[in-house]
Amino acid sequence: MKNQMMKHNPMGKMANSLIQLACPKNISALWSFGSLLGLCLITQILTGIFLAMFYIPNIYQAFDSAIYISRDVNFGWLIRSIHANSASMFFICIYTHTGRGIYYSSHQMKETWMVGVTLLLITILTAFLGYVLPWGQMSFWAATVITNLLSAIPYLGSTIVNWIWGGFSVSNATLTRFYALHFLFPFLISALSLMHIIFLHQSGSSNPLGLNSNNETMKFHIYFSAKDLIGVILLWIMLGSVVLLKPNLLIDPENFIPANPLVTPTHIQPEWYFLPMYAILRSIPNKLGGVLALIMSIAILYFLPMMNKPITKSASMNPKNKIAFWLLVTNFIVLMWIGSKPVESPFEEIGQIMTVTYFSIYMIMSKN
């Protein structure tokens, strides 16, 4: 009966295709981060729905409603803390997942890679919109500074900024729009994730050696589902430790102050996972140039499949690309540090050097 349902029922067929999925035998724990991203997405959607039930998208009540959730809603402090900190876990997983893809040349699977980069861009946008919603000092000023960057677009810039703001400054209309989009985008991410998985199942998974592994495969369940379960347990231990012991560890102290348009924070900065892109933005003296560099810091991933194909499909077999990859990781971490510092010497000069190095490394990796 069970086998009949798995073969003939549409939902059963989908489940069966996952269970019977042929995976390369030699994939490591780094291939588990895709399933961890799915877990983080489900966690974010569920906690976000509960938070949306109590949040008020109004500039006079948003900050108080966030405090009300933490103080008076049953387990509201837990739901809010899980939502805020699992966003950090989400980005740890997504950066590791992307890094693994670059290292093992997963960009050779073009359709899967393109959808994945689009997912990264929309996830970054969604996280930024969510950062604005508590309507603290850093939320307000981050919204003002980042949206104002669009004014660098020739001819249409100012009109686009006013359209996004819903007026001539960040106001109630802006907050309402950001709230609506922040609620909508996770469902768009879910749809794109399904596309990502469909393309992945069509092309088959990559492996550490970068070789054709069609003759050396194992069923996903129970072997790799058990391996993924270990990653899930470790992720929940990490998330639980932060949520229960240091819930405000990754939250900017300025955001515990209600938004005040008349007082500018000493140093405006986004969440830690945006700091590398923010450092690249600040390193270019010209406004339009900075915006283009910011966009290209992520959009350059779209061009990886079009660059020269490496002799070997995996950086583990290519000493030059292996060194270049770890230089890229180091560069990314240094940019994250620079983004958290004020725009003054020597941080400004280091940021400019690291920005040039960041884009140069991609060029080095693209050459045979």
From Swiss-Prot:
Domain of life: Eukaryota
Pfam families hit by this protein: Cytochrom_B_C, Cytochrome_B
Record-listed heme b b566 binding positions: H97, H196
Bilayer topology annotation: Multi-pass membrane protein
One cellular component term from this protein's GO annotations in UniProt: respiratory chain complex III
Cofactor note: Binds 2 heme b groups non-covalently.
Database matches in InterPro entries: Cyt_b/b6_C, Cyt_b/b6_C_sf, Cyt_b/b6_N, Cytb/b6-like_sf, Cytochrome_b, Cytochrome_b_C_euk/bac, Cytochrome_b_N_euk/bac, Di-haem_cyt_TM
Record keywords, A-Z: Electron transport, Heme, Iron, Membrane, Metal-binding, Mitochondrion, Mitochondrion inner membrane, Respiratory chain, Transmembrane, Transmembrane helix, Transport, Ubiquinone
Binding site residues for heme b b562: H83, H182
Needed co-factor(s): heme b
GO biological process: mitochondrial electron transport, ubiquinol to cytochrome c
Subcellular locations according to the entry: Mitochondrion inner membrane
Entry binding sites for a ubiquinone: H201
Transmembrane segments: 33-53, 77-99, 112-132, 178-198, 224-244, 288-308, 323-343, 345-365
GO molecular-function terms, A-Z: metal ion binding; ubiquinol-cytochrome-c reductase activity
Subunit structure of this chain's protein: The main subunits of complex b-c1 are: cytochrome b, cytochrome c1 and the Rieske protein.
PANTHER family documented for this protein: CYTOCHROME B
Family classification: Belongs to the cytochrome b family.
Function field: Component of the ubiquinol-cytochrome c reductase complex (complex III or cytochrome b-c1 complex) that is part of the mitochondrial respiratory chain. The b-c1 complex mediates electron transfer from ubiquinol to cytochrome c. Contributes to the generation of a proton gradient across the mitochondrial membrane that is then used for ATP synthesis.
Official protein name in the record: Cytochrome b
Organism (species): Bugula neritina (Brown bryozoan)
